[in-house]
Amino acid sequence: MGGILFIDEAYTFSKGGTDFGQEAIDTILKAMEDNRENFVVIVAGYPEPMEEFLNSNPGLKSRFNKNILFEDYSPDELLQIFNSFCRSNDMKLSDDAVQYLKDYLAHLCQNKPDNFANGREMRNLFEKALSNQANRLAQIVDISDDALNEIKIEDLENAH
């Protein structure tokens, strides 16, 4: 056996006290020990639950002894992510929507909720804005191509 196993939100194995979770942890630990030369396990998740996960079993902390903490994205980076969703969907932001989004992202980054989702937050915001845009345009009889491809400020205001 060899390769790389990536487990996102690994702490779900240790929550709830299920036998399945403990069995999965035991199996992973055994595979790591038996295949040290050619098997890598990477676990990922939010910092606090990951710390609890690593402390849930004496073998975990010693086997996962390298930690990399990825900082949250800045408002500018989040804007770039949102814009990439726009480009991928042939959409654009109106000028006032750009400024609104910049202000919203600055506020969001200063008041982050626990377990802030970064890129996923931008995907969700984009999808809600698209839904809002579709609802707004459904009330218009004659819709231009530009209107179909533009997210306006009101689409964003109701998206978060």
Stretch-by-stretch model annotation:
Residues 93, 108-160:
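C-terminal helical "lid" subdomain and adjoining coupling/linker elements of P-loop NTPases
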Residues 25-29, 51, 83, 123-126, ...:
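Short, well-ordered alpha-helical packing segments
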Residues 2, 7, 11-42, 48-61:
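Conserved catalytic/switch belt of AAA+ P-loop NTPases
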Residues 49-55, 70-115, 134-141:
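Conserved C-terminal "switch" segment of AAA+ ATPases
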